[in-house]
Amino acid sequence: MFGEDDLVRVHQDRSELILNIIVACFAILLARLWYLQIYHGKMFFNYSLENRLRKDVVRAPRGMIFSRNNVLLTHNVPRFDAVITPQYFDSPDDTIPALAEVLELSPDSIRKLLKKFQGQAKYLPIVVKKNISRREVAILETESNRFPGVSVDTFISREYTDGDAGAHLLGYISEISQEKLPKLRERDKYDYKQGDFIGQSGVEQQYDLDIRGEDGYQFMEVDARGRARRHVTSGDLYTGIDNKIANPGKNIRLTIDRDVQLAAYHALDGKDGAAIAIDIESGEVIAMVSRPGFDPAKFSTGLTSNYWGTLIMDEKHPLRDRVIQEHYSPGSTFKTLTAIAALEEGIIDENFKVNCTGKYHLGARPFHCWKKEGHGAVDVYRSIKESCDVFYYTIGTKMDIDILYKYATLFGMGQRLGIALPRETTGLIPNKDWKMKRMKQEWQKGETLSCVIGQSFVNVTPLQLASFYATIASEGKLYRPHVVKEVFSNTGEVLKSYKPEVIHQFKLKKTTVDIVKQALFDVVNTPGGTATSQKGVGIQMAGKTGTAQVMSFSAHNIFNKCENQEYKYRHHGLFAGYAPAINPKIALAVVVEHGCHGSSAAGPVAKAMAAAFINKYYPTYQKRLIAQDKMTYPQIIDDNRLNPDPMIMEKGEVNYYNDEGVLVKNFFLDKNAQAVNAGGE
């Protein structure tokens, strides 16, 4: 039996057990409270915030693109999209009809859209209608009680100052598709998001990571139905959660001169083709136009299927940049290369002559000259000036195709020149190895005769053609063409600058340079030249015309008038050269598709670019040209007073001849073209 002491001890043990249990329970409760409120307090607080806060992305405005003289070529315009966030869209039966009425959509189209995205996370917004009007924005914002879960997202759309005049050069932006997101994230190591816009061509694509900026975000306080109540400032939030300011993209200053660009664009009105002007002394692209074009702004405001279908089904391929992505037979503009190769290799000299009777026979096969009655006795100078085919057929029998390949590639043809723009093509300069690998056939001599006049397999881009003539003008210095001068911040700080880069340099014989340059001068400026129709008062060019066959004609059709042919079978017209003719500054290349003749079709476009350039940068030189219009090429060479003034828009020390013919050395220009230091001798 238990005694009284035993009974007391039992009660004490029970009390201690109960107390220990109570203490343990409190300890567990306190531990749990510590775990929830201290250890994971931040996490659970953030969960609670998600119920009353909405994180809105603040899109970073894209950087601006300027011309070389700081003319704004692109700008940003706000665009508004109506979106539904399913997490807060709790009254669809009531809201959808009202929303459809405001947005002028059918209720069924909204329901189908929501059904399409019902598998994605409910907090992700769904765009119901892009680019809504300001009236629609006002209704959705002021009557938000009627539209729970519906909000307005602001985007920045892109507009282009000159429309399609620079469409291929500047490019366009459009929304990244869901399929491309993973690939782009991997390629660029950048956290692209659904709804992001990205450059898809031209400068917009090539420099997208510079231009795009960095998005921020802003927290909004919302009610239980997802309606925005107020912006939340950083001081309102728990430690570790903060608003982020969007950082605008960097700005781009191009090498393009807008006036020369527009001159080329308007000169190509009603024509399909390409035009380019390059600074001979740096490789900077002054103008770059491809037609037909497209409206780049439409891509950033929500491209309609009809417009996209029109673009991709158009047989003229308006999306293709003909300057760098298309290649053409250069025709007679290539004869200059053949002449240089023959002179440099000693195959001919300045005294070599050919009697042109209008055709040349290789075995039993006739090769016709463009001039049916022939040119008579022709030397290398006249062969360029008057574009005699028979002269070059004769050279073709003496020249190995690999020699032609050597010089063409030396001048940058048949290869990518490395311009920093997407999808540059190589063109084609054939040789024996190429034909054997491609066709498993030996090279034939008759093929060389076609190649030396820029036909058959020979294909070049307008960019390569301009670079070739720039290299002639600089007497052997091939620059890498580029379209961007610098990248700079909104404060004006230059972050990157692009300097001239010489791909390679070589020296030509003086006799070669003298013959070729005089012939190119006389093509435009003296009677008998194939481009004398483009001689302009105060606008002095040197260059070469070309006609590129689209298809071969039979012997009885070869001399038929080109304009009488069906349009798609007409020859392309080309002009390539440089300006001014003496002490040149820019090289020019123009292709007019199915233009028939280089002089009448392409020549006026080149002349328009040369005129815009000389009028703007060398007004004094233009006056001298007008005064000295009767001078011959040798007289101009000897008259140093005709050396052009330096480009007034650039900085740097230069040497030039003043109006009195005195050599001025180390003339320093600032942006306002004021002399800082000058001396003469």
Residues covered by each model-derived region:
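Beta-lactam-recognizing serine transpeptidase/beta-lactamase-like catalytic domain environment
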Residues: 2-6, 12, 74, 118, ...
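Periplasmic/cell-envelope proteins involved in peptidoglycan metabolism and beta-lactam response
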Residues: 1-305, 327, 349, 402-412, ...
